[in-house]
Amino acid sequence: MDATQATRAVVEEMASVMEENRRLLTKLDSEIGDGDHGNNMNRGFKAALERLDTADPSTPADVLKAVSMALISKVGGAAGPLYGTAFLRASTALGDREEISAEDAAEVIEAALGGIKQRGKAEVGDKTIVDALQPAAEAAKEAAGEGNVVGVFRAAAAAAEEGAESTVPLRARKGRASYLGARSEGHQDPGATSTYLLLDAAARTLEGGS
């Protein structure tokens, strides 16, 4: 499997995971938000698969750009622009590369983080996607030195899981959840959770295909 096929396989698994966890994400979002995160992410990744069926991508970046366009056009709320920007920045970071090194993989995650932070103006501790994605990017960068793409995503996913769990006691400072004040405490952030699930899907897919 070449890098383009592998990237597509990752997106297919991400779509499957978003469908499988739709109710979980909806439950988490119902506690502190609009309750639509699960359905929105599921719809967005289904649209991404449809776009890939017609786009015929020739590089990993083409795959990521197609996902970006689908998420921006199909996912409502804050998640669409945020995740759409993340995938677009990841695509730009890869350029026209046909193969992906461990360093490239870490750069992709770092680029996604940069896009989300710029778009959402959030930092660690605000109870958002960033609480999962920033530690993931840091872990990915550290793991890249071992030269193993799977290891990069495995480290990123593990750090993102811890980051998502760390949002439980936090008081939300961004988005709709911030309107709840102290009532947002005691709940895991749905965006941080979906970030972990997406990175875990990538790690498992690449591990299975390596």
Q: PLM features: residue spans?
A:
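N-terminal loops that bind phosphate or other acidic moieties
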Residues: 1-210
